[in-house]
């Protein structure tokens, strides 16, 4: 049996592919943009498909060819690109997810694992705790597309019996991230310090943002996919990330344990701060993910940064 990963050349998708290859799975990777260095060391151990999620015929062809036991649907546009180009975000995120689910229905693929986001939360949050059932009223195009896709997945689950499961990721941190988004400073500050380059962090030192290391993000998808169907009651699961949630100042302090001379300055951006201000003072409760399928992150803030630098040292070609 095989598995299909959309967005397979991305930060999480490429790590997920590596993990699946190591498990002996037959892996098919689909992406619009191919980045060959992502798979250095495992070339030839996967089947690569180049396709746009907005092209239904290409998605049908990919699902028919791969005939996977499960589709990991990670492909899509992130927050800032989605807000800058909402039309493309609709075509990629909304129509693209419909194409994946409809292809799964047509070719009798019974399981779809979807990556959503905590950006589905926005207005009218009743602080101080957000959980899986908190009102989802996003303030961005990105968050809006993800709410729709969660609901579409639930519809396909109810009407067609597709075993749809989803996680709502916090900010995912890892080396080699290229696309700007509203919390990318958590990754770029770490990476710029490694390369000896200055970096302006676009939030205040006190700003707290939930983060999850990319290896934990990929591992969460494996755990969710492997859970027995009867355990999956909540369907769409919030992941809180590293606990306790660190501030931007604490991130910088942890980086400077490795690179004391790192040139990291704070230059808050009004748009970014408007977004982040709505989530300050909030605790994220992911206890149902732990209860229903055994979720628990392995990396602390310090462990994440140490492994981040280990990855950059061991695999420089993969992340540049």
For every predicted segment, state its role.
Residues 202-204, 209-320:
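C-terminal substrate-binding subdomain of Rossmann-fold SDR/epimerase-dehydratase oxidoreductases
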Residues 3-23:
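N-terminal Rossmann NAD(P)H-binding glycine-rich loop of SDR-like oxidoreductase domains
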Residues 25-36:
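Conserved glycine-rich Rossmann-like NAD(P)H-binding loop of the short-chain dehydrogenase/reductase
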Residues 53-92:
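NAD(P)H-binding glycine-rich loop region in Rossmannoid oxidoreductase-like domains
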Residues 43-55:
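Rossmann-fold cofactor-recognition segment
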Residues 154-209, 214-222:
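NAD(P)-dependent short-chain dehydrogenase/reductase
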Residues 98-141:
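Conserved Rossmann-fold NAD(P)-dependent oxidoreductase catalytic core, especially the SDR/UDP-sugar
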Residues 123-126, 137-165, 194:
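Active-site Tyr-X1-5-Lys
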């Amino acid at each position: 049996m095989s598995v299909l990963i959309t967005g397979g050349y991305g930060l999480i998708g490429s790590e997920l592919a590596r993990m699946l290859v190591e498990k002996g799975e037959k892996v098919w990777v689909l992406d619009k943009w191919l980045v060959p260095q992502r798979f250095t060391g495992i070339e030839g151990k996967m089947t690569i498909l180049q396709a746009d999620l907005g092209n239904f015929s290409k998605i049908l062809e990919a699902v028919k060819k791969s005939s996977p036991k499960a589709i990991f649907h990670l492909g899509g546009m992130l927050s800032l690109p989605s807000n800058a180009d909402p039309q493309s975000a609709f075509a990629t995120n909304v129509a693209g997810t419909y194409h994946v689910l409809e292809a799964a229905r047509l070719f009798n693929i019974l399981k779809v694992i979807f990556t959503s986001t905590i950006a589905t939360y926005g207005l009218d949050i009743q602080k101080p705790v957000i959980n899986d059932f908190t009102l989802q009223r996003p303030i961005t195009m990105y968050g809006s597309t993800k709410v729709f896709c969660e609901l579409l997945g639930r519809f396909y689950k109810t009407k067609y019996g597709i075993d749809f499961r989803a996680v709502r990721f916090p900010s995912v941190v890892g080396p080699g991230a290229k696309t700007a988004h509203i919390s990318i400073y958590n990754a770029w500050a770490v990476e710029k310090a490694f390369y000896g380059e200055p970096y302006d962090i676009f939030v205040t030192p006190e700003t707290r943002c939930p983060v999850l290391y990319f290896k934990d993000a990929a591992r969460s998808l494996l755990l969710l996919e492997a859970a027995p169907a009867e355990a999956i009651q909540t369907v769409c699961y919030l992941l809180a990330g590293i606990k306790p949630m660190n501030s931007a100042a604490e991130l910088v302090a942890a980086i400077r344990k490795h690179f004391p001379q790192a040139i990291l300055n704070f230059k808050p951006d009004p748009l970014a701060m408007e977004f982040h201000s709505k989530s300050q003072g909030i605790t994220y409760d992911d206890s149902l993910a732990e209860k229903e399928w055994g979720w628990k992150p392995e990396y602390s803030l310090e462990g994440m940064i140490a492994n981040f630098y280990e990855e950059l040292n061991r695999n420089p070609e993969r992340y540049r």
